């Protein structure tokens, strides 16, 4: 390509032609970036049916397992809240759903979190820490080394645990807000893993995880980050949301 001295020797018409070609080349380069493939290099997950890694999720899917179960007793007493009539106040008309096992289990020491802080942490934040670590390991990375220019895009839309914690006024402490605040869910990942890229939480209801992946792809193509962690988490721990959905006829009876 011509340098500045070469350009000075060109006629105005040739200089304009050169600049147009250079501008076109830059535009084409930008357009190529917008359609460049993005590699999925690692996964971490928890799904109903005991799926805790990509291999077990594939087994659940390939075997066509039905992961819908009756609402576990450690969530709430379904007999107390069930009524087949959707108009009954304070009741839900379904006894079933898709639930994860052992959502109260968490190795706080591994993540450098005190027992006191871990108690006030929403289990959704705990799950995000675990699966993010596993995703990086699955990608062949060493999470403890940290990665600069890595974005975090997390979908969240419900915080049953936060309502429980804040509902006990005498038990509210310095960790109660950070343990249940949506924005902290992404920030905690970035801080713990030593990441310096974009870090955000998105709430678009049922589409949240897809939107998080979409935003991650946009950020990668814009050059805001070189690697991105994207996903979502949703735990139903108390009956209120099911009661609300029942009143809106959003739940299948089976």
What are these model-predicted stretches?
Residues 2-4, 29-254:
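Cys-dependent condensing catalytic cores that perform Claisen condensation/acyl-transfer
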Residues 5, 9-12, 16-19, 26, ...:
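Heptad-repeat coiled-coil/leucine-zipper oligomerization helices
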């Amino acid at each position: 390509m011509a340098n500045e001295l070469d350009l000075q020797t060109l006629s105005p018409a040739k200089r304009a032609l050169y600049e147009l070609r250079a501008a076109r080349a830059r535009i084409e380069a930008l357009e190529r970036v917008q359609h460049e493939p993005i590699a999925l290099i690692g996964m971490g997950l928890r799904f109903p049916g005991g799926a805790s890694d990509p291999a077990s999720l594939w087994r659940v899917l390939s075997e066509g397992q039905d992961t819908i179960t009756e609402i576990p007793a450690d969530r709430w007493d379904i007999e107390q809240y069930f009524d087949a009539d959707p108009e009954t106040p304070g009741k839900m008309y379904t006894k079933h759903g898709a639930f994860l096992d052992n959502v109260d289990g968490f190795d706080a020491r591994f993540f450098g979190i005190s027992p006191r802080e871990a108690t006030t942490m929403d289990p959704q934040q705990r799950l995000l820490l675990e699966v993010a670590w596993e995703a990086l390991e699955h990608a062949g990375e060493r999470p403890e080394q940290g990665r600069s220019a890595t974005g975090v895009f997390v979908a969240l839309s419900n915080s049953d645990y936060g309502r429980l914690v804040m509902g006990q006024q005498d038990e509210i402490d310095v960790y109660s807000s950070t343990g249940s605040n949506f924005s902290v869910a992404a920030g905690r990942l970035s801080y713990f893993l030593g990441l310096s890229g974009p870090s955000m939480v998105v709430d678009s209801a049922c589409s949240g995880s897809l939107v998080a992946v979409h935003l991650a792809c946009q950020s990668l193509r814009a050059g805001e980050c070189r690697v991105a962690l994207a996903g979502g988490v949703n735990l139903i721990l108390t009956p209120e949301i099911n009661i609300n959905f029942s009143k809106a006829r959003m739940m299948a009876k089976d």
